[in-house]
Amino acid sequence: MMRLSVQDGYFIHPVSGKADVSIEGVITDSGTLSRNYYGSNNKLECWSLDSQYPHPDVPDASQQSVRCIDCPQNVRQSGYKPCKFFTTINVVPDKTNMVCEIRIGGASLFAKAVNKMSLFKYIDYLKRNGESIDTVLTEIYLVHEAVPKMYFKPSRPLAEDEMQTVTRLVE
């Protein structure tokens, strides 16, 4: 699967290399809330794919705690938590026939901005309006703040043929 990366505040298209501050696409999988902790040498030491318990592959010497909620790296230190939330979503960019991964950091999952929606706020918004995330063309855009964030907003509902195309691509 192709990875749609973010570099210097721009999405980088995985094929063309074109940089853009926003993309439109269909989110086909909203991901699983996960966590990771990078130690003092910036090496990944501990991680969780369910945000509850360290992954079984984490070496005992690197494991920070038996449960994520009890972990000392889950305590706010100087304005941030060393153990970071993230998720990886799957997106079919508009006018393409490919599925891409986008990694979304905690600031873009839980942001409390006015008139902007983090991923979780966006999913709740769609549910309240009788839609699901995979039936709407979504604009994902970057905002350059002290901590850069991704925000989400609906562009339009998908037509039936578009939904069928997306379903074929993800199967």
Per-segment meaning from a language model:
Residues M1-M98, V147-K149, S155:
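OB-fold ssDNA-binding interfaces and closely related basic DNA-contact patches used
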Residues P82-E160:
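Extended serine/threonine-enriched, polar tracts that run as long, contiguous segments within proteins
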Residues R156-E171:
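Short peripheral tails and domain-boundary helices/loops at the edges of structured domains
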